[in-house]
């Protein structure tokens, strides 16, 4: 027989790991005769979905379609969404831990890794976190306004985010106009000043973090040549590539195809530069050029391959630098934080030293993997959580009206709280705005507009 009382679960963060955790909690409760649950999801923005909305590139609608799974979870009567509420500002972690049976932190990695080189802060040098947020209409970044009038951009990093940034910079804006790219970004891209994007990676082709699909699709961008100097692949045998794994083997095959391509007159260019590190960014009041250093690969005693500076330098004119060398988790006030791993220390998802606080996603394991990686990660944490709930004292902790009191408490702390109904109003407005133009939606780019439409 199912018990009459309910375990109240809070999930802080509404990205993929948060929604996967919510779905896992609800599914586990369905399979249990001992546990009833109610899930409250708390989000700092008025909009849910995390990086699916504000991180996935606009020209990748298939990846964004996972939001349909999240919508299905949100329809469960045991689930509630509360947006525009910031943990550490409006409410504290200790207050959540006191009012909920369990709190799951799915806050991701909200900052970027710095290059730590001279000139990094010059106007025209921007973190990929900011640039991606800007073209995806994240309200925290809509005023960034990067100058895209120059002819050359340098993207530093050899992961998928670097490829996303490159595609947005080089793709015809008339193509992007049918996506959900932010209107302000589309207008900034329309003059098409950028003619060349140079992708710089400190290690070699065997050490890149690209997925093959993203690497290959660069060749499909109309009016753009993808160029790789054959010398950069010298010494890489089929055996070397195969030993590095399936994805790397396929990537090397794609890169080899790019080495034999002949540039076409009038085409824009994407140029790969491996074994190259940024040394200094120069310019008078803005980015004008970047000093690049040539590297060689060395293997340490533990078998790890690292890039070593050879001392050779080159100065390359550039007007835009996008730093895409990784994300960083940031501390949540009131919770432990490990600066070396940029995660919240945990054991099987349970926050170390805590009775009822848990973590999922990037803040649990670091910023690695793709969206789907978070599904198993979240499930593992929920398994730990459900075991703890099953072993807890089976007496009622809160009253029957606790859900109502939680909603009242949140509204008291944040009078501009966004509920599921408010988000649905935003969603309808954005979709309706996009429909006449053949776009999936036109995103509202700032907090005031989101709240105005949401609250009606």
Swiss-Prot record:
Q: Which UniProt keywords apply?
A: FAD, Flavoprotein, NADP, Oxidoreductase
Recorded GO terms, molecular function?
Answer: ferredoxin-NADP+ reductase activity
Cofactor(s) the protein requires to work: FAD
Q: List the disulfide bonds.
A: none
Enzyme class, spelled out: oxidoreductase
UniProt key word RNA-binding: no
Query: Where does the chain bind NADP(+)?
Result: 113, 158-161, 202-203, 214, 369
Write down the chemical reaction(s) this protein catalyses: 2 reduced [2Fe-2S]-[ferredoxin] + NADP(+) + H(+) = 2 oxidized [2Fe-2S]-[ferredoxin] + NADPH
Work out whether the entry's keyword set contains Amino-acid biosynthesis: no
Q: Where does FAD bind?
A: 17, 43, 51, 87, 362, 369-371
- Report the protein's function: May serve as electron transfer protein and supply electrons to P450 systems.
Name listed for the protein in its UniProt record:
NADPH-ferredoxin reductase FprA
